[in-house]
Amino acid sequence: MAVTMYYEEDVEVAALAGKKIAVIGYGSQGHAHAQNLRDSGHDVIIGVRQGKSFDRAKEDGFETFEVGEAVAKADVIMVLAPDELQQSIYEEDIKPNLKSGSALGFAHGFNIHFGYIEVPEDVDVFMVAPKAPGHLVRRTFTEGFGTPALFVSHQNATGHAREIAMDWAKGIGCARVGIIETTFKEETEEDLFGEQAVLCGGLTALVEAGFETLTEARYAGELAYFEVLHEMKLIVDLMYEGGFTKMRQSISNTAEFGDYVTGPRIITDEVKKNMKLVLADIQSGKFAQDFVDDFKAGRPKLTAYREAAKNLEIEKIGAELRKAMPFTQSGDDDAFKIYQ
């Protein structure tokens, strides 16, 4: 299905002009949205609970308040706290202070789409979802361009929800490179599927399986690390720049031939069937409920998964090898740690 890409010149209404904007949360996305909007001339305050993020926002020059106070002062509110915290923040701090005719925004549709947050009918609901982590949203903005984003007008109580979403996307720099209109359902389900089946879950499982295959065949773990993980960035960067075509033009004929004949042996029809099952769990809300239930129980499953992942042999070997490769580290990593 074809989509329309919108740019700065398509944002015809300065819907945020003269409005008080509250960014709720000052983590990876929160600091980027807030700083970019401020640099674009908007009136931005921060709503965040006491702690490191509260202190960081004040150090960065923002008027900073407890969440409820910030919401009460604002005309447009953007919720950029982690997904698992948004429901409680909304019920305890946002909902009691939300004014009729105000606008409530999100950068991911999880809580709205799956029904964990229900907004009164007299409030606009919108989304602006940059397709990049917060430190890149900020860095690319300061470099004079930006990152692509999705935007949604979900609940149009005032008749201006779409204009607010587009002006927000412009204010954080995304409309410089292009924004696409979508729905909460589409953004949420596609985003979760991409993370689980390909970008995070699928990729790490593939790398780990490749590493284990080589080391179980008595190849050196250090060499296996280079072959299945370290060189991944080189290939992904080529695809990022020019798709499969540029990647295949840049590798050897041997590698390209192996790509065509072996890829289908790894990603079989059975794998695709499993991907469809993963998508079904997302669409039905099963994954969302499992995630929320684990959080409410104190994260026993997530904690166990993290502990097991930390102890993987590929992680231990990689940590040692990267000590001799300072070029694998970057300032962006530091920025992400500061604002997560």
From Swiss-Prot:
Cofactor note: Binds 2 magnesium ions per subunit.
BP term (GO), one: L-valine biosynthetic process
Binding site for Mg(2+) 1: 191, 195
Xref: Pfam families: KARI_C, KARI_N
Lineage: superkingdom: Bacteria
Coiled-coil region list: none
Span of domain KARI C-terminal knotted: 183-328
Annotated binding of NADP(+), by residue: 26-29, 49, 53, 83-86, 134
Keyword field: Amino-acid biosynthesis, Branched-chain amino acid biosynthesis, Magnesium, Metal-binding, NADP, Oxidoreductase
Residue sites binding substrate per the record: 252
Cofactor(s) annotated in UniProt: Mg(2+)
Active site feature: 108
Entry's EC annotation: 1.1.1.86
Pathway: Amino-acid biosynthesis; L-isoleucine biosynthesis; L-isoleucine from 2-oxobutanoate: step 2/4; Amino-acid biosynthesis; L-valine biosynthesis; L-valine from pyruvate: step 2/4
Catalysed reactions listed for this entry: (2R)-2,3-dihydroxy-3-methylbutanoate + NADP(+) = (2S)-2-acetolactate + NADPH + H(+); (2R,3R)-2,3-dihydroxy-3-methylpentanoate + NADP(+) = (S)-2-ethyl-2-hydroxy-3-oxobutanoate + NADPH + H(+)
Domain called KARI N-terminal Rossmann: residue spans: 3-182
HAMAP family for this protein: IlvC (MF_00435)
PANTHER family: KETOL-ACID REDUCTOISOMERASE, MITOCHONDRIAL
Its biological purpose: Involved in the biosynthesis of branched-chain amino acids (BCAA). Catalyzes an alkyl-migration followed by a ketol-acid reduction of (S)-2-acetolactate (S2AL) to yield (R)-2,3-dihydroxy-isovalerate. In the isomerase reaction, S2AL is rearranged via a Mg-dependent methyl migration to produce 3-hydroxy-3-methyl-2-ketobutyrate (HMKB). In the reductase reaction, this 2-ketoacid undergoes a metal-dependent reduction by NADPH to yield (R)-2,3-dihydroxy-isovalerate.
Family to which the UniProt record says this protein belongs: Belongs to the ketol-acid reductoisomerase family.
Protein name according to UniProt: Ketol-acid reductoisomerase (NADP(+))
Originating organism: Lactococcus lactis subsp. cremoris (strain SK11)
